[in-house]
């Protein structure tokens, strides 16, 4: 949704008969507001401010005794502007993480280098608006906070250990600094039941799904820390942290709707990726409607080898391939690219026969411009000492074979390995001690 479309939606909602509130004496208004707040509190728990769309937030602010109109469009926009920049909308005195950049996502999509934005002047919400949020029975606080942060100086990667307010569970998200931009890797579950042989999170086993509020809290924290640390613009977002996104599809779908809204978190869907091992063809079919780029963590192109690496997988690679092809066909033409990911392991899936098998898997179902193969050298994990990453020479040879087969192919550099923040390493010792270890 564009910013203009969002504004038109806000105006339409506020102009509707449901948004009309007849003039009543001030005392009566306050009494009614208190009664309505009490009823709302009884009927349903509050939602985090991060998961309330601007048009709904405008109506909610309009219910406050401090409201000047029944639909507070401008105040809702100021709240979301603060959220987008990493400010705390409940704290009008938040000093703001003033250094850093915001940048233009359009320019970044076109490959331009974006200069740093001017330093901010503090929070974007007034004390009045902060009070309106604080006293609302329907608006809840941000659902998570950073428990600990660690830094890999060699790569500039920063891991945030995030404690969830609901039950104290821990998840991780990672800020990855590139040359002219920053990427954020977020989690969708506590633990993961897919049990990939090379993944530390899979070793934790199944914990629980994250709520929409908890997913979006990671996004907000990423924006907040990127600004505090004066990182390049945070414009890339990937669901490649803890958990299998398609096993928590309803929450991931709802979170993505706000992540990619121009008047909410304002990430481009071209720069937002949902990565999955594809639990089933049905999961993949449902994935097609997501406002994000799709990525398939295939890891091996033959069933025998893939089931050793992903032991919970019960569907053939051909079934899953056809499901991805159908999902892409249902999307708009400009969103029909699939990223195919392989975690390369020495002597396991990095040979010439593995490259040929991948080409033979992809070629019948996809055109050249639909596929980007991304090779990820495995990062070491304590529970699988016999597995190690493919050598640079093996990765380059695999890449050349894929190029010769007619598909684009990149080799991802490892980042965050020193701080156990790289792909496959997102597992918290505290969570393992809490009983998620099999």
Where are each of the predicted segments found?
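Conserved AdoMet/S-adenosylmethionine-binding subsite of the radical SAM
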Residues: 223-401, 405
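Conserved Radical SAM active-site core
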Residues: 95-123, 128, 132, 168-292, ...
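Auxiliary Fe-S-binding modules of radical SAM enzymes
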Residues: 11, 15, 20-167, 328-337, ...
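Sec-dependent signal peptide recognition
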Residues: 2-9
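Short, charged, solvent-exposed linker or helix-capping segments at domain edges/interfaces
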Residues: 185, 307-308, 436
